[in-house]
Design a protein with these regions (language model features):
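Charged helix-capping and loop-helix junction motifs
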Residues: 154-164, 195-202
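Loop/turn elements at helix/coil->beta-strand transitions in domains of secreted/extracellular proteins
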Residues: 86-88, 132-137, 172-177, 212-216
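Active-site segments of SGNH/GDSL-like serine hydrolases
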Residues: 140, 144, 169-199, 224
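Conserved SGNH/GDSL esterase-like catalytic core that processes O-acyl groups on lipids
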Residues: 76-160
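N-terminal secretory targeting modules
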Residues: 1-86, 102, 258
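Catalytic His-Asp segment of secreted/periplasmic serine-dependent ester chemistry enzymes
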Residues: 185-260
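A mature extracytoplasmic/lumenal domain signature
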Residues: 93-96, 104, 143, 181-184, ...
Length: 260
């Protein structure tokens, strides 16, 4: 009888020990889980705080890249046209640039072109630029600049061009600068003015200027096939309506590459 009671007592002791061990395991598991969860929560909270501390300007490049990618996909799917990709910009230039406005391709308020315009007429548009506060500034001058032989001035064409661009940056210091190369005229038009044959010289200066200042040089000259492409009006200088989508796509491609 005593043995049976002893055996029963030992069984109870073993059961209590097992229960105790299980309780300890459960407590340890709970503590580990709680600690691990707290670390994840703390990490999440730290990330949120870090994001909140970031200024809007710091987040803007990331958001802009995402927006550009979404727009590129939409354009590839035929939901947008190339002109929709021009955003928060101004486009300065001569009568060639005015075609973007005249044909209804771009916002007239943002196309700051002039008939007979030269790089020296940037001053005429500084008030508009200050009002619009664009983040992208596109420039396309050259034909009239060559006609006026601006390269003969002190410091050459690049010096004059750079001075004018810096006037813009004094107003919108964070704007990205995009400089279109000069597109040559046709060989027939060149016969009317030998000055227009300086495209290569002027473009070399523009390219070097952009490299020096970390601006983006856009090679548009290649679109002309040395003046033999079917892109010109009868005067051999101005462009057909059909050329503007091609020109616009070249500009947007360069913009996306520069900002990617």
């Amino acid at each position: 009888m005593i043995n049976k009671r002893g055996q029963h007592k030992r069984k109870n002791q073993r059961s209590l020990i097992l229960i105790g061990i299980l309780c300890i395991v459960m407590i340890c598991t709970f503590v580990f889980f709680l600690h691990h969860t707290n670390k994840e929560v703390q990490a999440g909270q730290a990330y949120v705080v870090a994001q909140e501390k970031k200024s809007t300007s710091a987040l803007k490049p990331t958001l802009e890249k995402k927006r550009q990618a979404e727009m590129s996909q939409a354009m590839a799917e035929g939901k947008l046209n190339v002109y929709s990709m021009f955003d928060d910009y101004v486009f300065l230039g001569d009568s060639r640039v005015m075609g973007f406005e005249e044909y209804g391709y771009l916002d007239a308020n943002r196309v700051l072109g002039d008939s007979g315009g030269t790089i020296k007429r940037v001053d005429d548009h500084l008030n508009d630029i200050q009002s619009l506060k664009p983040t992208r500034v596109y420039l396309s001058y050259g034909m009239n600049d060559m006609g006026l032989k601006i390269n003969d001035e002190e410091g050459g064409y690049a010096k004059v061009y750079e001075t004018e661009v810096k006037k813009i940056l004094a107003i919108v210091p964070n704007a990205k600068i995009y400089v279109c190369s000069i597109i040559p005229c046709t060989p027939e038009a060149l016969q009317k003015s030998s000055s227009w044959g300086q495209v290569g010289t002027y473009n070399q200066q523009l390219k070097a200027m952009c490299k020096k200042n970390k601006w983006t040089y856009i090679n548009c000259t290649k679109l002309a096939d040395n003046g033999n492409a079917d892109i010109y009006q009868s005067d051999g200088i101005h462009f057909l309506t059909s050329f503007y989508p091609v020109w616009a796509q070249t500009i947007i491609d360069a913009t996306q590459k520069a900002e990617s």
